[in-house]
Curated annotation (Swiss-Prot):
It is an enzyme of class 2 (transferase). Its EC number is 2.4.-.-. This is Putative glycosyltransferase ORF300. It comes from Acidianus filamentous virus 1 (isolate United States/Yellowstone). Gene3D superfamilies: Glycogen Phosphorylase B (3.40.50.2000). The keyword Nucleus does not apply. One of its GO terms (molecular function) is glycosyltransferase activity.
């Protein structure tokens, strides 16, 4: 049996569920931050972040023969950690080039990059109605863009035509605005339904390490995305520079945010919405492919 351990984070649990479907005799265990899971299986795949004392302590205490660590970091770690006490064979598999560089700086050798994955697939033709529909995934990093986005939506309506926005994710506390629908936190199937009616998607996060760009591409929806970190490598659509990335002080997590001009942002929305054809998602972003790659380490 292969046991998958996954941190209790919404996007990673969704991914782990899809990966487990393609691994024979697979058992999925969702773990809390403080938990030391019971592991009796020979092979373990751990999914989540790694640069954390509690996480590494947990990994050191489980009993297994072979462990694959499919991991990411959303911030540069402040402290170096070591996995030297692990008593089993392990492979560190980063999800992106940025993650690979971070782990190799702090831990050492890593394996080839295996990006995040999805099994979303478009089953309906792209909609083209009189009203343009956009989907926005909200994370804390996007809050800084909310007012600018609303101004751009208002500008678009006055100059180009009707536009409706559906926002999901961390939308708690966001002010109401005509034609902007805050959907809150949605399940996997509900997110897929949103993308099935969307003409375009927006991801303007400063950190931008999440799943929306891959999910939108899988649903063949073009995206307006922030040109930062690794999102530029797995998004299809139109990019916009959201921040002077060299000016970010990660030590204090200071994120200087220049102001978007509503005209510029509205023009970018218009540009991405005019993309009619989006190619199918490359195989390397499919969880069926990911499962084969991860299990290959355990079978070597």
């Amino acid at each position: 049996m292969t046991q998958i351990l996954v941190k209790n984070a919404f996007s990673w649990v969704n991914i782990a569920e899809d990966v487990c479907k393609f691994i024979p005799n697979c058992k999925l265990t969702v773990i809390d931050k403080e938990a030391i899971p019971s592991v009796e299986d020979t092979n373990v795949i751990y999914i989540g972040d790694l640069m954390n004392v509690k996480t590494i302590s947990m990994l050191e205490r489980i009993k297994a023969k072979n462990v694959v660590l499919w991991v990411d970091e959303t911030r540069v770690p402040k402290t170096s950690y070591s996995l030297k006490n692990l008593k089993y064979n392990y492979w560190i598999v980063p999800v992106s080039q940025w993650n690979k560089e971070v782990y190799e700086e702090h831990i050492g050798h890593t394996e080839e990059i295996i990006p995040r994955c999805t099994e979303f697939r478009r089953t309906e033709g792209k909609r083209r109605g009189n009203v343009l529909f956009g989907v926005v995934s909200f994370t804390p990093g996007v809050y800084k863009r909310y007012e600018e986005l609303l101004l751009a939506v208002d500008y678009y309506r006055k100059n180009y035509g009707e536009l409706e926005i559906y926002a999901y994710g961390h939308t708690e506390g966001l002010p109401s605005f005509p034609g902007v629908h805050n959907m809150g936190r949605l399940g996997k199937s509900e997110i897929q339904k949103l993308y099935s009616i969307a003409d375009f998607a927006i991801e303007l996060g400063i950190e931008a390490f999440g799943m929306p760009s891959i999910e939108a591409w899988a649903m063949q929806v073009p995206m307006l995305y922030g040109n930062v970190n690794d999102v530029r490598n797995h998004a299809y659509g139109v990019s916009i520079d959201p921040v002077d990335f060299d000016a970010i002080d990660f030590g204090e997590y200071i994120l200087p945010v220049p102001i978007y001009d509503e005209y510029k942002l509205a023009e970018k929305i218009r540009e991405v919405a005019e993309i009619e054809e989006v190619p199918e998602l490359p195989e390397k972003y499919r969880c069926s492919y990911t499962a084969k790659k991860l299990i290959s380490y355990l079978e070597a």
